[in-house]
Amino acid sequence: QAGGDQTILKVIEQAYGKLDYKNHFYLERGPYVLASVVDESDISKDPLILKGNYIDLFEPNLPVLKQKVVNPDEQAFLFNIDAVKNKKKPQVLASASRQYDEQTGKRSYSFIAKSPAETNNVMRILLPKQPKNVKVSAPTFISEWDKATHTLLLQFENNPEGVQVNIEW
């Protein structure tokens, strides 16, 4: 029925109070953030600007961002590093693999990463301190430390049998 949505909105406003209309959807579940800005809105054409320490899960290299701008007709899937409860505990925050046999020592963290062959792994690992030694059983790997978030970016070729990762700080 034409105009039925206005009737429903009036009933909701009477029951709950003033409604705040926005051009975006925003959802947090634990450290995960989903955001979408619609371009069909008469309310606003403004982007949604999120500030904090985020890993952009839609980007293949898992960049760390201080700010994410979500424009109309765009979506974002982020990991909020600031929402991690125990930042002293080494942990994989985002990865293109499953981790097995995780071992945490006073100054070390190790695990086996398994994922399909002929694919690349990109992972971001939260560590209590900057690593002094990183060993990966893959033929080659790239590691990059982000001082501001205490996260280590690791990239290497996956192996379904497992890639051993050993980190010491």
Segments (PLM) and residue ranges:
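Short proline/glycine-enriched turn/loop motifs at strand-loop junctions of beta-rich domains
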Residues: 39-42, 49-51, 116-119, 126-132, ...
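Proteolytic processing hotspots in large secreted/extracellular or virion-associated proteins
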Residues: 104-121
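Structural motif
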Residues: 29, 105, 146-148, 159
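Solvent-exposed beta-strand/loop surfaces of large extracellular or lumenal domains
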Residues: 51-67, 135-155
